[in-house]
Amino acid sequence: MNYTTQMDAAKKGIVTKEMEIVAKKENMNVKDLMELVSKGKVAIPANKNHKSLDPEGIGQGLRTKINVNLGISKDCYNIDMELEKVQKAIDMKAEAIMDLSCFGKTEEFRKRLIDMSPAIIGTVPIYDAVGFYDKELKDITSEEFLKVAEKHAENGADFLTIHVGMNRKTAATFKKNPRRMNIVSRGGSLLYAWMELNNKENPFYEGFNKLLDICEKYDVTLSLGDACRPGCIEDSTDASQIEELIALGELTKRAWERNVQVIIEGPGHMTLDEIETNMKIEKKLCHGAPFYVLGPIVTDIAPGYDHITSAIGGAIAATHGADFLCYVTPAEHLRLPNLDDMKEGIIATKIAAHAADLAKGVKGARDWDNAMAKARRDLDWERMFELSIDEEKARRYREESKAKSKDSCTMCGKMCAVRNMNRVTEGKDLNMLRDDD
């Protein structure tokens, strides 16, 4: 193999098997895709050690992809349950899964996840550091943090989320500009704490060249984390968030010089009117790199319904440039999600992604909706169920309602507009009063 990474291959004019697969999925010319990869506008996360991967592209002109978060925690240390969630995410065709495990020895779960998953796998190495070394956070050395990142890359993680932009300059900006919610990024808060406790620079920022060595070796995509993402609408688009984004733009160029693919992570909580501006700022400051957003969550008052607040924000964000949506479940801010929460979160996020693809004019996006419109016009219930984003729920609602006619539902009965327009255009009587037709 005469290339190191997908980006290196693209710059050399080499079409990889991963590019061929992605181009076919996206209904696009593989040479056009290769050009986007060479410029960093599209990333194809594909670790050389992830043998079960069914690759996907993330970025400009492609379908909006979604990510599912899962992982073991101290309060819910159940590997079998988390593996059930993995299977659920795979069955529901999530393009990516992030292992956010944050307690104990996580390698067993991570390796099993990567072995079984055709989806892109992402991890956050700093979550693993305390358990990896059985050390207090402040006692972990800079070199040890990098070794954890290398272990995750060696295991086969396709992208690593690392909050490199939380450097001393960003930290100083944060201190000068108090926030209502401080730092709500788990990884960002851990790095900030380590820096404060040790009076040192961010080990990933200081050792960025070594981090790039790791990414280049395994063809790991670097997902530059947003330590200063807003945790409430009052903190959005503030000095800390923008200062960090400027740093991420500079780091992006350094990574691309080494042929390391980059994804930029983004907010967070913000009101509807700020979303479009934030998408444009990221694309400008980070040179068109793919943008990966959590939500955005558009109001802070809906615990139990944050899959909805997130889907609203995600649809707007993806319409205006976000390429990758992290799902949010009804359990957000309340507990570790269960399987039912997962399903709700995946469905809501897939709806947001598809709605944005329609608005962006992504090739082929309208085909699904047009097929549903035809099935509805034809009153073809079976086809409607097959096309539904949640087939099980659609079937259940229909079966529970016990409509008297196969041509209608319990909402309108024989006053169904579709039924009556079909009949009248065919020259048939409406037969509104008889039950036998």
Swiss-Prot record:
InterPro entries: ThiC, ThiC/Bza_core_dom, ThiC/BzaA/B
GO MF, any single term: 4 iron, 4 sulfur cluster binding
Record function comment: Catalyzes the synthesis of the hydroxymethylpyrimidine phosphate (HMP-P) moiety of thiamine from aminoimidazole ribotide (AIR) in a radical S-adenosyl-L-methionine (SAM)-dependent reaction.
Residues bound to Zn(2+): 269, 333
Enzyme Commission number(s) from the entry: 4.1.99.17
The protein's enzyme class: lyase
Cofactor(s) required for function per UniProt: [4Fe-4S] cluster
Catalysed reactions, as listed in the record: 5-amino-1-(5-phospho-beta-D-ribosyl)imidazole + S-adenosyl-L-methionine = 4-amino-2-methyl-5-(phosphooxymethyl)pyrimidine + CO + 5'-deoxyadenosine + formate + L-methionine + 3 H(+)
Cofactor note text: Binds 1 [4Fe-4S] cluster per subunit. The cluster is coordinated with 3 cysteines and an exchangeable S-adenosyl-L-methionine.
Keywords annotated in UniProt: 4Fe-4S, Iron, Iron-sulfur, Lyase, Metal-binding, S-adenosyl-L-methionine, Thiamine biosynthesis, Zinc
Family matches, as NCBIfam families: PRK13352.1, thiC
Family classification: Belongs to the ThiC family.
Name by which UniProt lists this protein: Phosphomethylpyrimidine synthase
Pathway: Cofactor biosynthesis; thiamine diphosphate biosynthesis
Gene Ontology cellular-component terms listed: cytosol
PANTHER family: PHOSPHOMETHYLPYRIMIDINE SYNTHASE, CHLOROPLASTIC, THIAMINE BIOSYNTHESIS PROTEIN THIC
Listed GO biological process terms: thiamine biosynthetic process; thiamine diphosphate biosynthetic process
Residues the entry annotates as binding [4Fe-4S] cluster: 409, 412, 416
Organism: Clostridium botulinum (strain Langeland / NCTC 10281 / Type F)
Annotated residues for binding of substrate: 69, 98, 127, 163, 185-187, 226-229, 265, 292
